[in-house]
A protein has these predicted regions:
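C-terminal structural cap/anchor segments
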Residues: 178, 200-201
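Catalytic-core region of carbohydrate-active enzymes that cleave or remodel glycosidic bonds
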Residues: 209
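Radical SAM enzyme core and accessory elements
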Residues: 228-234, 240-306
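Flexible glycine/acidic-rich beta-alpha junction loops that bind and position SAM and/or redox cofactors
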Residues: 54, 157, 161-162, 191-199, ...
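Short, internal active-site loops enriched in acidic
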Residues: 11, 98-100, 129-130, 282-289
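A structural micro-motif
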Residues: 2, 10-11, 120, 183, ...
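Radical SAM [4Fe-4S] cluster-binding motif and immediate context
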Residues: 25, 29-186, 193, 206
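Glycine-rich beta-alpha loop elements in corrinoid/cobalamin-binding modules
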Residues: 1-18, 220, 226
Length: 306
């Protein structure tokens, strides 16, 4: 098997290096019969594209996959139909890095879902800078109920340093509009981006409390090889490839105190603070407006309803 890096007792072994297959449509549908998927969460995943048009400095996607590349619409909907008919799937999440980067393609996917009268609940990871109200309204019509926007900070200064290409007023408007459509919304925030100050955390707290997402994923930054932020800091920081680190990279009492204040404020606003994966079981049938915040990966498919 080419393109593998394997750690063995003798050391690190690298198999034949072959060029990445850029034409997504040459790849077969995943064979889910190779493992017992009934042992996993009931929300199934589908990847319909690779890459992203963004250039966020902390993200590997544009540097690993290169330009954005989407699968054929019919192929995508065939896989959706297979998940439903063969595996009795009720919920599917588009696990693309940015499912809505190509508006026309997503419209065509929705049209095909509608044409086949497919009944399923969907979720999608979306870049907030690619937000399109008309598109999300159509997606909602065919069964999409959940979206994830990576916002990362409430500081205009840090947004520019991250190269997010958005501003605070835009963020607030997008979240407000998306809520009105009816979506359950997850947002993510990085709390220890390099040069973060007490004031930056305060601004992040203010933004979170103003937009009140249903799900809040709180991160400490993972420095990933190949990203600009890694290259800028590789000689001075401890690096981790693990995105779910539970320790901040910046040792600063002011930052720590503000993060603790943020947690207390969230609890006052009736956010359920989740500390480990076991806790997800109690939210399986929770109300669709249940608010959750976590430093651990949040389970997909919770609180999705018609």
């Amino acid at each position: 098997i080419p393109n593998l890096v394997i750690r063995t007792e003798e050391g690190i072994f690298i198999t034949e290096n072959k060029v990445l297959i850029n034409d997504f449509n040459k790849l077969p549908m995943p064979n889910r019969d190779l493992l017992d998927i009934s042992k996993y969460m009931e929300t199934r995943t589908i990847i319909t594209s690779r890459g992203c048009v963004g250039t966020c400095k902390f993200c590997t996607t544009p540097y690993y996959f290169g330009k954005w590349n989407g699968r054929n619409v019919i192929d995508v909907v065939n896989e959706i139909e297979t998940l439903i008919t063969k595996y009795n799937t009720k919920k599917i999440i588009f696990l693309d890095d940015n499912a809505t980067v190509n508006k026309q393609r997503m419209i065509e996917i929705c049209k095909e879902i509608e044409k086949r009268n497919i009944k399923c609940l969907f979720g999608a990871l979306c870049s907030i800078k690619c937000y399109d109200k008309d598109l999300l309204e159509y997606m909602y019509k065919v069964g999409f109920r959940w979206v994830h926007f990576g916002i990362e900070t409430g500081s205009e200064r840090l947004l520019k340093l991250m190269n997010k290409e958005i501003d605070i007023n835009y963020i607030k408007q997008v979240i407000e509009d998306t809520k009105k459509i009816g979506y359950r919304i997850r947002t993510s925030f990085i709390l220890d981006y390099p040069s973060s100050t007490k004031e930056d955390i305060i601004k992040t707290k203010e933004l979170i409390l103003s937009i009140m997402p249903h799900e809040l994923r709180l991160h400490y930054l993972a420095y990933r090889v190949g990203t600009p932020i890694y290259n800028e800091n590789k000689d001075i920081l401890n690096k981790t490839q693990y995105i779910h680190s539970n320790k901040p990279n910046i040792k600063n009492n002011d930052l720590t105190n503000e993060i603790n204040k943020l947690i207390k404020e969230l609890e006052k606003e009736n956010y359920n603070m989740v500390s480990n994966d076991i806790d997800w079981n109690i939210y399986e049938n929770a109300d669709k407006n249940t608010k959750i915040a976590a430093f651990t990966p949040i389970k997909y498919g919770m609180c999705w309803y018609e």
